[in-house]
């Protein structure tokens, strides 16, 4: 078995065709392979096939030459057809007919009905034809060969079917008009299968090619190339305009869109108004689908827009003409294009004013009156923001189709809150427009009609000259007045960031009353803290309720109650004592006459809930955090406020009732009640106290004088006699213990010898015995009660002895 081929084609032995060095390298590489050793016949077949295809394939690599050597003129079984001739043009990679042929021999074909013989075996010796010619899988190592042919750009191919022409005509065509044989074979197979109603599976490709008419460009199959919608970003965040790349559409594509959109409900959006929005990508996809679904509506809307513009030009109305050119679909009241629920939700989320303008134009006159009325009632601080609202209303939206996606404008307060249901996002911004108040302030309204005139004065030092700078420093008051702008804040305070936290309000000097006051101070209901600044020194007033802040500084404070015209916080203890505590001979103070005025809109107030008419001068309770007294009869006012009686009645002070009877708790004796009111005849004579009777009532000097018998007995003997008759009860357990006695004795000895033993003084009483009342048993009608407390590291025990007539009372009861 040699490595040289057994047979060679003499016609190509002396001719060096183009690319011969590639074939020599390929054959040299194949000599050492296992396939060349097993199949000797394969060498001659490969050599003959390579020489045959070299005329047409030129420098095509050997592996492509093996695939291109199959001639499309053969049938499925590999034999030559009688109606066709060998075509010298480039061979196709796919067959013309993919149907199975019944004429194929079972022994000569595989399961896929493909034979192992080719067109080169025709006319060959019989023993060579019978032997199967296996195609080589290629060299064992990957090889890269140079080629001069350019690779086809698949993206530039026009996927249309063209006529079959000769090789010269096909080569003369441009590169992008030539097609791969695989695409042509597949398209041709589709045409053949569609031309016959029931194609026979055994029909050969030659029959199909003969029965089909000549293919023209009009009968070609065009593979439609879908033009995707491009996503153009707009000024909106998470919002895009989905428009087609081509601004003009053909009539066929428009008819197809109209036919497809008939079966789609325009109102059936992907997301309904009550669905939960998960993320922005879901909204974008839903909006894109709605844009495609409403293409028919947009086209009809554009036609209506053109008619509307022409009609406006004929009338000559310049204002309507400008509005219809920019916003013909949105400003019309009669024509309303159907809009899906998803589009409505996107408009509400991103501030589109199209739907709001539709509803507002229907009630334009009513809305305009409501706006003018509410604009006049707002404060000066919000007029600048409302000016931008007018410019926003004058600016009309521009609609290019049925759905308008405008750039996101900054949200402004919408006045007509009850006119449109789409003004919820704007009202959400109003709640955050007001500045944050202090935790001590309970400001619930900014309407000037509900504010109360507060008179604040500085009366502590009447010698303060008019040239002195006096200010009120209060964060709570400045926060309440920030929106109203009724008081002029200090310019220095507005420039200094630290002073903005404690803005200063200038006080005015009254030459008549010689006092400082704040003019025109209107505050809503709430609690306010303040301090006075005199020549830059912070202080507080003693004529106002005082409290302490978190840092321990003294501050003044007052409370504004709702429903009063004018209040003046004031505290004067002398005036309070003279007004609250009148004598019985003086007439009781009467409340001032009540004045009827419109009730307040506050429903949470105690007075408005009860429907009580409020006086012009309040009886408010300015007691402060320290529960200090008030100038306005606080006790009577609190009782009236807490009671359910008539609040119109006069205040009646409580009358004290005196008695001459001594309660039994304070009677000292055998329990008999002594009445002062009783006559002397009713009182029974009793034995005077002595050593043997009622010893507790005896005088100590008289008692011991009797015991000593005029000096016959000394004091110690008399004391021993007394203790023998009336023994003193024992001390408590923790005081009568041997341990404590031993410690006390040691301490006494150390003190006498002037030697302090600190370790010996350790008489610490257990904490469970502290602040507990300890008693002893009743002995000789005497009971002792003791209690130990701790004071600055020392223990103090107090023992109280009290008489107890338990036996005497028991004997009297038994008698």
Curated annotation (Swiss-Prot):
Composition bias type Low complexity, residue spans:
313-326, 377-389, 599-608
Task: Specify whether Thylakoid is a keyword of the entry.
Answer: no
Alphabetical UniProt keywords: Cytoplasm, Lipoprotein, Membrane, Myristate, Phosphoprotein, Vacuole
Q: Where in the cell is it found?
A: Cytoplasm; Vacuole membrane
- Where is the sequence biased in composition, kind Polar residues? 1-11, 32-42
Task: Fill in the subunit field for this protein.
Answer: Component of the SNF1 kinase complex, a heterotrimeric complex composed of the catalytic alpha subunit SNF1, one of the three related beta subunits SIP1, SIP2 or GAL83, and the regulatory gamma subunit SNF4. The beta subunit serves as a bridge between the catalytic and the regulatory subunit. Interacts (via KIS domain) with SNF1. Interacts (via ASC domain) with SNF4.
Protein name, as recorded:
SNF1 protein kinase subunit beta-1
- Please state the gene responsible for encoding this protein: SIP1
């Amino acid at each position: 078995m040699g490595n040289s081929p057994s047979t060679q084609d003499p016609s190509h032995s002396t001719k060096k065709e183009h690319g011969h060095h590639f074939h020599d390298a390929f054959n040299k590489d194949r000599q050492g392979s296992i396939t060349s050793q097993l199949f000797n016949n394969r060498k001659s077949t490969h050599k003959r096939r390579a020489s045959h295809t070299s005329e047409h394939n030129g420098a095509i690599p050997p592996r492509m030459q093996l695939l291109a050597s199959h001639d499309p003129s053969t049938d499925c079984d590999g034999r030559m057809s009688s109606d066709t001739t060998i075509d010298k043009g480039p061979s196709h990679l796919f067959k013309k007919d993919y149907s199975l042929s019944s004429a194929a021999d079972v022994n000569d074909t595989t399961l896929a009905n493909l034979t192992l013989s080719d067109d080169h075996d025709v006319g060959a010796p019989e023993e060579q034809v019978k032997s199967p010619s296996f195609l080589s899988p290629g060299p064992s190592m990957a090889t890269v060969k140079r080629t001069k042919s350019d690779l086809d750009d698949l993206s530039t191919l026009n996927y249309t079917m063209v006529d079959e022409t000769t090789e010269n005509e096909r080569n003369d065509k441009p590169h992008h008009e030539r097609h791969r044989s695989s695409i042509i074979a597949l398209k041709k197979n589709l045409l053949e299968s569609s031309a016959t109603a029931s194609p026979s599976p055994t029909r050969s490709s030659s029959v199909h090619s003969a029965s089909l008419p000549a293919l023209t460009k009009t009968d070609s199959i065009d593979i439609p190339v879908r033009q995707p919608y491009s996503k153009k970003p707009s000024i909106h965040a998470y919002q895009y305009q989905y428009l087609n790349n081509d601004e003009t559409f053909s009539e066929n594509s428009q008819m197809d869109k109209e036919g497809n959109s008939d079966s789609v409900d325009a109102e059936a959006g992907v997301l309904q108004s009550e669905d939960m929005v998960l993320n922005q990508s879901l909204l974008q996809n839903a909006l894109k689908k709605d844009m495609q679904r409403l293409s028919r509506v947009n086209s009809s809307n554009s036609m209506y827009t053109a008619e509307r513009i022409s009609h406006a030009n004929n009338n000559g109305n310049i204002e309507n003409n400008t509005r219809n050119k920019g916003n013909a679909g949105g400003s019309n009241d009669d024509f309303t294009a159907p809009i899906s629920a998803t589009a409505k939700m996107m408009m509400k989320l991103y501030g589109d004013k199209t739907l709001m303008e539709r509803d507002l134009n229907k009630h334009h006159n009513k809305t305009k009156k409501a706006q003018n009325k509410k604009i006049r009632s707002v404060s000066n601080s919000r007029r600048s923001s409302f000016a931008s609202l007018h410019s926003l209303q004058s600016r009309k939206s521009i609609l290019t189709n049925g759905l308008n996606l405008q750039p996101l404008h900054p949200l402004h307060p919408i006045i007509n809150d009850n006119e449109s249901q789409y003004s919820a996002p704007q009202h959400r911004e109003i709640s955050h427009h007001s500045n944050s108040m202090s935790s001590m302030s309970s400001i619930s309204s900014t309407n000037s009609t509900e504010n109360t005139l507060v008179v604040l004065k500085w009366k502590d030092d009447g010698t303060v000259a008019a040239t002195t700078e006096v200010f009120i420093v209060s964060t709570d008051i400045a926060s309440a007045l920030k929106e109203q702008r009724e008081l002029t804040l200090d310019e220095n305070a507005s420039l200094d960031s630290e002073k903005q936290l404690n803005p200063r309000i200038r006080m005015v000097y009254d030459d008549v009353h010689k006092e400082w006051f704040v003019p025109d101070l209107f505050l809503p209901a709430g609690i306010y803290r303040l301090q006075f600044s005199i020549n830059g020194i912070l202080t507080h007033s003693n004529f106002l309720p005082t409290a302490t802040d978190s840092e321990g500084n003294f501050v003044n404070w007052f409370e504004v109650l709702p429903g009063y015209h004018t209040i003046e916080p004031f505290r004067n203890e002398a005036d309070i004592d003279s007004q609250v505590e009148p004598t019985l001979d003086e007439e009781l103070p009467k409340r001032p006459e009540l004045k009827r005025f419109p009730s307040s809109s506050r429903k949470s107030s105690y007075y408005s809930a009860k429907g009580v008419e409020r006086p012009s001068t309040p009886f408010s309770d300015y007691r402060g955090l320290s529960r200090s007294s008030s100038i306005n009869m606080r006790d009577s006012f609190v009782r009236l406020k807490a009671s359910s009686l008539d609040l119109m009645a006069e205040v009646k002070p409580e009358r004290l009732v005196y008695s001459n009877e001594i309660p039994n708790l304070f009677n000292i004796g055998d329990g008999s009640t002594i009445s002062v009111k009783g006559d002397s005849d009713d009182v029974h004579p009793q034995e005077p106290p002595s050593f043997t009777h009622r010893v507790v009532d005896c005088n100590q000097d008289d008692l011991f004088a009797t015991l000593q018998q005029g000096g016959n007995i000394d004091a110690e003997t008399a004391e021993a006699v007394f203790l023998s008759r009336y023994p003193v009860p024992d001390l408590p357990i923790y005081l009568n213990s041997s341990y404590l006695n031993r410690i006390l004795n040691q301490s006494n000895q150390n003190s006498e010898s002037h030697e302090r033993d600190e370790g010996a003084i350790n008489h610490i009483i257990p904490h469970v015995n502290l602040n507990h009342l300890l008693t002893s048993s009743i002995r000789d009608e005497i009971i002792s009660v003791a209690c130990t407390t701790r004071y600055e590291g020392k223990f103090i025990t107090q023992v109280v002895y009290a008489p107890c007539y338990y036996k005497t009372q028991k004997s009297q009861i038994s008698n």
